[in-house]
Amino acid sequence: MSHLESMVLCREAQVSTLQSLFGERHHFSFPSIFIYGHTASGKTYVTQTLLKTLELPHAFVNCVECFTSRLLLEQILNKLSHLNSSDAGCSTEMTCETFNDFVQLFKQVTSAEHLKDQTVYIVLDKAEYLRDMEANLLPGLLRLQELTDRNVTVIFLSEIIWEKFRPNTGCFEPFVLYFPDYSIGNLQKILSHDHPPEYSADFYAAYINILLGVFYTVCRDLKELRHLAVLNFPKYCEPVVKGEAGERDTRKLWRNIEPHLKKAMQTVYLREISSSQWEKLQKDNTDPGQLKGLSAYTHMELPYYSKFILIAAYLASYNPARTDKRFFLKHHGKIKKTNFLKKHEKTSNHLLGPKPFPLDRLLAILYSIVDSRVAPTANIFSQITSLVTLQLLTIVGHEDQLNGPKYKCTVSLDFIRAIARMVNFDIIKYLYDFL
């Protein structure tokens, strides 16, 4: 256990819970476990490390790689069949057309002597992609232990909550385990663990402390922070290498690295340039804004529905109001663009600038573009207020007017396209100027 804790830092409670769920090798474990948490919260790493360290038979499948249920089921079967084969290259690839075929083939694979008397684990990473496959797949995997009468546990790893998975018809409920975000103390401990051997642990820990002081408010992603730590460490060491400062001259080292980290917030975090381009920038002492190919917008972390509110506001600002029926109603009939054109509308709406729109139109568009129904709660209205505070929306006229406030969207086309990409929304299809 101590060896496992040294490999998996700051996840002792989750490791302990999983070990208690797994139990002894020959005991029947929980049929299905649903593990969720934000990106880079350690879900995949902890699960894989635990299964490998305990040497438990398992098949790990990334659902992103399997765009059909057939590919997914075949990959599970083939990985399990390789566990039986002494030489993985000699085993034949298995095929199955339906979930019923999968159940029968799974029984055959797990009847081998090596797998018969112990729990077999199937780990499905990026499990949210299962929702786009056949309706019977998720309920079937949740009840796989019952359907096959085998000692099997299916582990789902996802970034979204279980309530977004649960079918309307009902299903077997898995054991739900939450991986919270790493605290700043956790990140300090994990990142300090990666210190280069040529420098002392205290020196690298001081650097990580500075790095988190700058980036923690805008980025909690462990992978991003680890990337930033590796990328910016040579600049932090520069005064020490040149003999201008010692390892304990924290103030001098901070003054040297501070402008460098501020530039890093504007470029590398957005992945608008590669690491090699970033290093070249620092050698040439070039302003990041001068690099060809960079966009002008700045990065913001917005809540999920705030992104859709901003998209709806942009559509309301740049589309004529009477085109809403065309874009957001399913049965609008065939309408040609030329039927809408008047003399003053032949100019692009993007050249004329954003038009004001009422709140009810914004909400109507929002409900049309969001997949799941969004109730008009105080949370939605507070997010609109936040967007106004961030100056992404502006209020037109007086706030106390009787017929309700009107708004304008102030963001650029490049900015809104970047926001739309984050939520997989093709905004160009809904813009009147691009018909």
Swiss-Prot record:
Pfam family, one: ORC5_C
Subunit structure: Component of ORC, a complex composed of at least 6 subunits: ORC1, ORC2, ORC3, ORC4, ORC5 and ORC6. ORC is regulated in a cell-cycle dependent manner. It is sequentially assembled at the exit from anaphase of mitosis and disassembled as cells enter S phase.
One of the record's GO molecular function terms: ATP binding
Compartments (UniProt record): Nucleus; Chromosome
BP GO annotations: DNA replication; DNA replication initiation; regulation of DNA replication
Cellular component, GO, one term: nuclear origin of replication recognition complex
Protein name: Origin recognition complex subunit 5
PTM notes: Multi-mono-ubiquitinated by OBI1; ubiquitination is important for efficient DNA replication origin site activation. Ubiquitination levels are low in mitotic and early G1-phAse cells and are induced in late G1-/early S-phase, peaking in S-phase and decrease toward the end of the cell cycle.
Lineage: Eukaryota, Metazoa, Chordata, Craniata, Vertebrata
Protein family: Belongs to the ORC5 family.
Record function comment: Component of the origin recognition complex (ORC) that binds origins of replication. DNA-binding is ATP-dependent. The specific DNA sequences that define origins of replication have not been identified yet. ORC is required to assemble the pre-replication complex necessary to initiate DNA replication.
UniProt keyword annotations, A-Z: ATP-binding, Chromosome, DNA replication, Nucleotide-binding, Nucleus, Ubl conjugation
